[in-house]
Amino acid sequence: MASRFPKFSQGLAQDPTTRRIWFGIATAHDFESHDDITEERLYQKIFASHFGQLAIIFLWTSGNLFHVAWQGNFEAWVRDPLHVRPIAHAIWDLHFGQPAVEAFTRGGAPGPVNIAHSGVYQWWYTIGLRTNEDLYTGALFLLFLSAISLIAGRFHLQPKWKPSVSWFKNAESRLDHHLSGLFGVSSLAWTGHLVHVAIPESRGEHVRWDNFLDVLPYPRGLGPLFTGQWNLYAQNPDSSSHLFGTSQGAGTAILTLLGGFHPQTQSLWLTDIAHHHLAIAFVFFIAGHMYRTNFGIGHSIKDILEAHIPPGGLLGRGHKGLYNTINNSLHFQLGLALASLGVITSLVAQHMYSLPAYAFIAQDFTTQAALYTHHQYIAGFIMTGAFAHGAIFFIRDYNPEQNRDNVLARMLEHKEAIISHLSWASLFLGFHTLGLYVHNDVMLAFGTPEKQILIEPIFAQWIQSAHGKALYGFDVLLSSTNSPAFNAGQSIWLPGWLNAINDNSNSLFLTIGPGDFLVHHAIALGLHTTTLILVKGALDARGSKLMPDKKDFGYSFPCDGPGRGGTCDISAWDAFYLAVFWMLNTIGWVTFYWHWKHITLWQGNVAQFNESSTYLMGWLRDYLWLNSSQLINGYNPFGMNSLSVWAWMFLFGHLVWATGFMFLISWRGYWQELIETLAWAHERTPLANSVRWRDKPVALSIVQARLVGLAHFSVGYIFTYAAFLIASTSGKFG
């Protein structure tokens, strides 16, 4: 008999119902639960899958380069980055009528195309690419790397080349290699690329493999490095009249500390960026020698942790036992990695618009909005994943004996205090913020807007002033002309910083007022509530007041009736599930705030945000309704334009989102009735009844139905906002 799916679980493969398919898909990546899994095979499978992941990433980025080179207008865009719309790829659609063909034929293309809002044109331009040939070369190189990654993954699954468990658990060596090799070497290599290729290209000097060894990136070469005159590398930077991509106004410096932005491109100075990467490389080369390996230098992480015993004894046995706990738990390590990556991704979103690194990207408003929103959503999903794996760690990997009275055990022991404090913070933020908004709504509704409660964010304004923003008149630190830091800033370091922070044409330290104060606290409410749900889910994963015996029930047990006090909504999975809704709504508020504030800034009517953002009707009317009006006008052959597809996607996104609720408000008996009815109808329908299946149809489990609902809610939510964001921004600014 042919083996049935799933091969990794004999128990499931023999299941006579459709549960076999769904549970097979659900546990396909849960290697730990597979038949015949050993610790060694687990580590090797994950290691090999990393190469597969790299192959997919390289293939995807190669595809971006290839399609732009083939169907884009990169060379035309390079000649006039501010007025030519960058093309992502061509559209070939049988459904397009003549009005659609005309509406989507843009950017000098011969037929319908999609416009790129990803910033890849600006990125490739900044790093020195100039022709389609450059793009094709990059695509082929990445395709080669993709193939190498696939071969490497297959190679490391061969018996002779499988690494041992001890190799995977050698934390010090891995850290040293990742710090020095991954971060250090790649940062140094990137500095090299910027200095040898990107900076000369920005000054009109074309450097490629044929002349790479002949063109000195700095007139005196490595002389200043060996003679200790490093300051020479910063002398004669590009002038404020420099035209990017030409020699007009160009200097010779390669490593600078100018601060602020290039006046023409509105992006960070390339020579500052090169300097930054060189500094990072230096720091990481040192960091990569921090942990002791075979060479006898550096520290043992275990020794460091075991030495961490607080003198007063207030933290019990301190960090004893933590090294083995972390080193033997893949879920703990994944949780730490996801938490770090989530924070970094959110910081990337904040810095991409406030300190744009790519030439001319700051003037491409739709791209700025799309990139900010994209990175915040990615960060949200990654961070919720961190807590999910933290919860799985407590269920599968946590050993109370090994961690007796250390910081981890003590955190579990006072989890009630942690959870209740988070709860109080959330309640305080929620009631007070909503109270202020609602009060202001009532005052406007009753015709007394002067009675609004408007609170100036004075602490945040003081922090902005300390960084040099002079508008508020605080006269503190960098905004005080008497401060030594202010005077040094004019001459020694970052002379361009103070000009940039006080220039109203960029997004650096935006002016804030009462509307910002309110939405800041609304976002704080969302963050604290999301954190509360996630932290509670992880800390209660092994057992809670209601159900002290969760360990053997696993991560995602379903509702189980009133026995043991009822198990509804108390598995760690239930907490993750609820937290994702809060995460999405919180990021909704974050992106609404960012987008509305920037639209008014770009249009030159900041008063609209300042006046309308202090009450809820202002948000609904002047942000959501006003900016979606183009998307709810409908579409027809006469009014067809390039926003019509976004109008359709806006509708479609709402539909997917609403479908999610059908799966969320239900219980298992409902699904079983539904599937029985569908199966009955199918078997009695001509033609359809000639198709039979071997598996008996059974209902979705409660957890599965919730997952289907959550997936539709998330996808629909993001589709809806993506259409709104891109259409409302590109509709205004082209």
UniProtKB/Swiss-Prot annotation:
Q: Out of the domains of life, which is the source? A: Eukaryota
Major location category of this protein? plastid
Q: Where does chlorophyll a B3 bind?
A: 662, 670
A GO BP annotation = photosynthesis
Residues at which chlorophyll a B1 binds? 654
Query: Where does this polypeptide localize?
Result: Plastid, Chloroplast thylakoid membrane
Molecular function terms, GO-annotated: 4 iron, 4 sulfur cluster binding; chlorophyll binding; electron transfer activity; magnesium ion binding; oxidoreductase activity
Enumerate the UniProt keywords alphabetically.
Answer: 4Fe-4S, Chlorophyll, Chloroplast, Chromophore, Electron transport, Iron, Iron-sulfur, Magnesium, Membrane, Metal-binding, Oxidoreductase, Photosynthesis, Photosystem I, Plastid, Thylakoid, Transmembrane, Transmembrane helix, Transport
Q: Provide the residue positions that the database annotates as binding [4Fe-4S] cluster.
A: 559, 568
Q: How does it sit in the membrane?
A: Multi-pass membrane protein
Q: For phylloquinone, which residues are the binding ones?
A: 671
Its recorded reaction(s) are: reduced [plastocyanin] + hnu + oxidized [2Fe-2S]-[ferredoxin] = oxidized [plastocyanin] + reduced [2Fe-2S]-[ferredoxin]
TM stretches of this protein: 46-69, 135-158, 175-199, 273-291, 330-353, 369-395, 417-439, 517-535, 575-596, 643-665, 707-727
Task: Return the GO cellular component terms, semicolon-separated.
Answer: chloroplast thylakoid membrane; photosystem I
Q: Which HAMAP family match?
A: PSI_PsaB
What's the stated role of this polypeptide?
PsaA and PsaB bind P700, the primary electron donor of photosystem I (PSI), as well as the electron acceptors A0, A1 and FX. PSI is a plastocyanin-ferredoxin oxidoreductase, converting photonic excitation into a charge separation, which transfers an electron from the donor P700 chlorophyll pair to the spectroscopically characterized acceptors A0, A1, FX, FA and FB in turn. Oxidized P700 is reduced on the lumenal side of the thylakoid membrane by plastocyanin.
Record text on subunit structure and interactions: The PsaA/B heterodimer binds the P700 chlorophyll special pair and subsequent electron acceptors. PSI consists of a core antenna complex that captures photons, and an electron transfer chain that converts photonic excitation into a charge separation. The eukaryotic PSI reaction center is composed of at least 11 subunits.
Q: Which NCBIfam families match?
A: psaB
What is the protein's given name?
Photosystem I P700 chlorophyll a apoprotein A2
Q: Which organism is it from?
A: Cycas taitungensis
Could you read off the lineage of the organism from its UniProt record? Eukaryota, Viridiplantae, Streptophyta, Embryophyta, Tracheophyta
